[in-house]
């Protein structure tokens, strides 16, 4: 079988839970608990988002700034090195790991595409043997983390845009894509073979209408 272009979402598709919250909060609690009161600054952009006046990217940006702004690159790298191994060992779906291994054996081009950030997603991708990573970028000021986003939040229609660009970069390849939520459907529907993993009932109904297969992973 010829190689395929295979795109995996990360949070709740490969991993059992969200990754950004435990990554950032784990760092703060262990390394800089004095920053906890700064999370109050996340409330205003969250309210704006809930009222439809802002996008989720601004909430993410404010959260990252509250938790990590000003942190040295060496400290971020050290925390990432500590955070990723147990996440892969104990925080992933066995079925996801098996499917990744199958695609690697088949010689497929594996892309990890996530709304989570480039502080740690590329490390996860390397550890799992992915060929390429697309994720939300975060700005640095020299050796210190700024926390502003340098890319659009890689979610929803933005993922569909990135998926379309990937297909253009790899012409002639069949495509397989895995995601877990209704916000993944815009790019799953574009794939030759799209799979909704452990989706909600509402997401499953929408997936079936779009011809996206539904699977359950443990």
What are these model-predicted stretches?
Residues 20, 59-61, 142-148:
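Acidic/polar active-site rim loop that often engages polyanionic ligands
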Residues 18, 71, 158:
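Conserved active-site and cofactor/substrate-binding residues in soluble primary-metabolism enzymes
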Residues 59-94:
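Metal-dependent phosphoesterase signature
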Residues 1-3, 78, 85-218:
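C-terminal cap/substrate-recognition subdomain and adjoining C-terminal extension
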Residues 4, 31-33, 37, 50-56, ...:
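Conserved alpha/beta cores of soluble small-molecule-handling proteins
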Residues 1-51:
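Active-site neighborhood of HAD-like aspartate-dependent phosphohydrolases
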Residues 46-49, 57-73, 132-137:
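Short, compositionally biased "basic patch" segments
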């Amino acid at each position: 079988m010829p190689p395929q272009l295979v795109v995996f979402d990360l949070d709740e598709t490969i991993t059992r839970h969200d990754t950004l919250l435990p990554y950032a909060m784990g760092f703060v609690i262990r390394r800089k608990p004095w920053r906890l009161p700064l999370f109050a600054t996340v409330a205003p952009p969250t309210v704006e988002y809930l009222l439809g006046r802002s996008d989720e990217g601004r909430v993410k940006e404010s959260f990252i700034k509250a938790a990590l702004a000003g942190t040295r690159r060496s400290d971020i790298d050290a925390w990432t090195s500590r955070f990723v191994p147990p996440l892969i060992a104990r925080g992933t779906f066995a079925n996801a790991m098996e499917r990744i291994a199958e695609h690697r054996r088949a010689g497929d081009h594996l892309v990890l595409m996530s709304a989570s950030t480039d502080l740690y997603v590329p490390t996860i991708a390397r550890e799992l043997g992915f060929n390429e990573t697309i994720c939300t970028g975060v700005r640095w000021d020299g050796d210190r983390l700024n926390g502003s986003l340098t890319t659009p939040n890689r979610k929803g229609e933005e993922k569909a845009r990135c998926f379309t660009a990937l297909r253009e970069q790899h012409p002639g390849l069949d495509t397989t894509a895995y995601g877990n939520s209704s916000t993944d459907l815009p790019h799953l529907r574009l794939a030759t073979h799209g799979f909704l993993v452990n989706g909600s009932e509402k997401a499953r109904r929408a997936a079936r209408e779009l011809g996206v297969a539904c699977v359950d992973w443990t």
